[in-house]
Amino acid sequence: MLSSPALAPGRDVPRWMLALSRFISRVWPTFPAIRIDAALLSRDPAVVAANRADPLVHHGAVPARTGAEILDAMARIERGRDTLRVPVLVYHGTEDKLTEPDGSRAFGAGVGSPDRTLTLYEGGFHETMNDLERDRVIDALIAWLHAHAPAH
């Protein structure tokens, strides 16, 4: 199960920034590369407020090395996705600005498992289980788990 996975760079990220990020991560790994706006997590203002108030959530910028490692992981996942043979569920909000919904589409189309499900929640933000349609998302997740759990 993959919930709004980071499988492709965002379409709004300039290509020069992607190329430069690897260089910066080597020479200045702690460089504060990008800040994540909590307002992009959910359309539910209570979820956004809870995130901003949570002392256990990192509110600083993502270091350049972390960003470069995520980009490298994306490439490894893309190269190996056709070897995956277990049941796969991917779900993503179509208005996610933190991770790219097109990455989930491409992964869903290219994964090797014949048992694959891609669900896109129209208008949904990054945290689909904490967004406005959370009940629908959770119900679909539970139904998928029941369909894939061994009978006992």
Model-derived segments and spans:
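Short beta-strand/loop motif that positions the catalytic acidic residue
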Residues: L84, V90-H92, D96
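Active-site nucleophile elbow and catalytic-triad environment of alpha/beta-hydrolase enzymes
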Residues: V62-G80
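Short alpha-helix in the alpha/beta-hydrolase fold that links the catalytic acid
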Residues: V86, E100-G110
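Acidic catalytic loop of the alpha/beta-hydrolase fold
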Residues: H58, E95-T99, E127
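Catalytic active-site module of serine/aspartate enzymes centered on a nucleophile-bearing elbow/loop
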Residues: D115-H152
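Conserved hydrophobic packing residues within short motifs/helices of P-loop NTPase cores
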Residues: M1, L89-Y91, T119
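Alpha/beta-hydrolase-fold enzymes
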Residues: M1-V62
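Generic recognition of short, well-ordered alpha-helical segments
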Residues: R15, D102-G103, L132, R136
